[in-house]
Design a protein with these regions (language model features):
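Hydrophobic, membrane-embedded alpha-helices of multi-pass small-molecule transporters
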Residues: 29-46, 181-187, 196-260, 279-301, ...
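Helix-loop-helix connectors at the membrane interface of multi-pass transporters/channels
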Residues: 93-97, 125-142, 230, 300-331, ...
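Membrane-interface loop-to-helix entry segments
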Residues: 128, 142, 146-184, 198-199, ...
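Membrane-interface "cap" regions at the ends of multi-pass membrane proteins
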Residues: 1-62, 203-209, 227-237, 455-475
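Transmembrane alpha-helical segments of multi-pass small-molecule transport proteins
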Residues: 109-113, 134-157, 171-182, 211-222, ...
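Hydrophobic alpha-helical segments and their helix-loop junctions in multi-pass secondary transporters
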Residues: 171-197, 212-216, 255-263, 368-380, ...
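C-terminal membrane-solvent junction of multi-pass transporters and transport-like membrane proteins
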Residues: 327, 366-446, 464
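Loop-to-transmembrane helix boundary motifs in multi-pass membrane proteins
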Residues: 262, 311-346, 394-413
Length: 475
């Protein structure tokens, strides 16, 4: 396919979870930078970044160091998932069948769907409150519908439109946050801007964990946005475009939140602090962030839809849905989330975020297994046809080795967890720091490798696997 033909690709995406033929690939690797840079300059990462100085009482310097370390570490895992896209040509969650089996992958896929539905619902509530904050005459429920409709339309149109919006958003939001930094730093209203807080190792670890988990949360759908790139796009270029875009964008947003709350008197809500600290530009900054929420939330809807379709296709293996099916599922999720968000109690977002944090615990072992399997064991060579078979083809319905490593990866995290839904005994000795994700990664990775390489079925799978690039039968 020539560049002109690729640029002429239809705006409305026709694929869902099926294999993307080499002739249908399009786009440039730099699109991944703009997608993840623009998508991460938004209220939620700003609020999360402020927690290091608000909740864990770090000063600005140590807060920034913790943010940078967490983003740098978590971004590696996130970008390694992204680099699988051009090599495989299929969405991330359906590719998990190669590790867990056609039925074994169902649990992880359902969890991913629930998590991204939760993200979508919580973000439309945030969008509704933002609309009300900008124009008080607009009720929050109306604002919720406005935010949901905007994200829903973007998600239904699909991949190409999402990339176009984020190419524009990178420039607009990049300039906006740069001006915002200048306004805050030139109008600091506190005498303790640099001295408020201090250094506490436990608080520093907790901030690193929050920062790293922000990146890891993208892992189940990050390659959904790189799978359309031409198959000759290398792993390294995909990795670096994603890594730099996501880590730079989210690091700027995290630091912006920390700077904003330190520039105003202690105790102020983060977004109120942003509005006050940026002075006359405050309302404009809120408008930019609202547009960012709407655009970025389309990724959550898109990822949720693909995960739901993947789950259903497990039991209807001959069904490779089209754009119409994707639109129908999008509308169902959209309506359900609007209904729940409008009719729920005031602590809806808080409860939803608590659930999402708990679900991250079960996604960390999946991340470890997926990356070890792709890069170390199979080295990117898979039988794509088997992934779409009812019996899993050479991968089977269940992979006991992956499921055992997965279960152990969850269990070992439990004592280290510190979420609103459950707190293990160890965080109390670490000042509340939740290191469960790190423990899960460090145990699951070598355990899965050890189990997989000693399994005779693994050798059969490896011998039968073919490169995605050479497979032309899946439509």
């Amino acid at each position: 396919m020539t560049n002109a033909e690729r640029n002429a690709s239809p705006m409305i995406e026709k694929h869902t979870i099926g294999y993307v033929q080499p002739a249908e690939r399009h786009g440039k690797v730099r699109d991944l930078f703009t997608l993840w840079f623009g998508g991460n300059i938004a209220p939620l990462p700003i609020v999360t970044g402020a927690l290091g100085v608000q909740m864990f009482h770090l000063n600005l310097m140590w807060g920034i160091v913790a943010i940078v370390v967490g983003q740098a570490v978590g971004g590696v895992l996130m970008a390694l998932h992204s680099a699988q896209g051009p090599q495989m040509g299929i969405p991330q969650m359906i590719q998990s069948r190669a590790q867990f089996g056609s039925w074994g992958a169902l649990l992880v896929t359902v969890i991913a769907a629930v998590m991204y539905v939760g993200f979508f619902a919580s973000n439309i509530v945030l969008a509704g409150k933002s609309v009300h904050g900008i124009a008080s005459s607009v009720p929050v429920p109306v604002g919720i519908v406005i935010g949901a409709v905007g994200s829903g339309l973007i998600g239904i149109v699909g991949y190409r439109f999402i990339h176009i919006l984020n190419r524009i958003g990178t420039w607009v939001l990049g300039i906006g946050i740069a001006v915002g930094f200048w306004m805050i730093l030139s109008h600091v209203n506190t005498a303790d801007f640099l001295t408020r807080g201090g250094f506490d190792f436990a608080g520093w670890l907790a901030t690193v964990s929050l920062s790293a988990l922000w990146q890891i949360a993208f892992a189940p759908y990050v390659s959904d946005y790189s799978r359309y790139l031409p198959e000759d796009v290398g792993v390294a270029s995909t990795f670096w475009a994603t890594y730099l875009g996501c880590t730079i964008g989210s690091t700027l947003a995290f630091i912006f939140g920390a700077v904003a709350v330190l520039a105003v008197p202690a105790g102020m809500d983060t977004m109120d602090a942003v509005k006050q600290a940026t002075g006359p530009l405050g309302p404009l900054m809120l408008v930019l962030f609202l547009l960012s929420v709407i655009s970025h939330n389309a990724l959550n809807l898109y990822g949720a839809v693909l995960a739901v379709i993947t789950s259903v296709q497990t039991f209807a293996y001959k069904w490779i849905p089209t754009a119409k099916a994707r639109a129908v599922v999008s509308v169902v999720i959209f309506v359900a989330c609007c209904y729940a968000a409008i009719g729920a109690s005031t602590n809806f977002v808080g409860n939803l975020v608590d659930l999402v944090l708990a679900l991250l615990v079960v996604l960390v072992p999946w991340t470890a297994i997926n990356l070890i399997d792709f890069y170390v064991i199979h080295k990117g060579k898979y039988d794509i046809q088997s992934i779409f078979m009812a019996d899993g083809g050479i991968y089977g319905r269940f992979n006991p080795q992956a499921l055992l490593a997965y279960a152990m990866g969850i269990v070992v995290q439990i004592p280290f967890m510190n979420t609103p839904m459950y707190a293990g005994p160890i965080p109390a000795h670490l000042g509340g720091a939740d290191l469960s994700w790190l423990v899960g990664l460090l145990l699951t990775s070598p355990l899965y490798y050890w189990l997989a390489t000693r399994d005779s079925a693994y050798r059969r799978r490896q011998g039968g696997a073919v490169s995605a690039a050479s497979f032309d039968a899946i439509k």
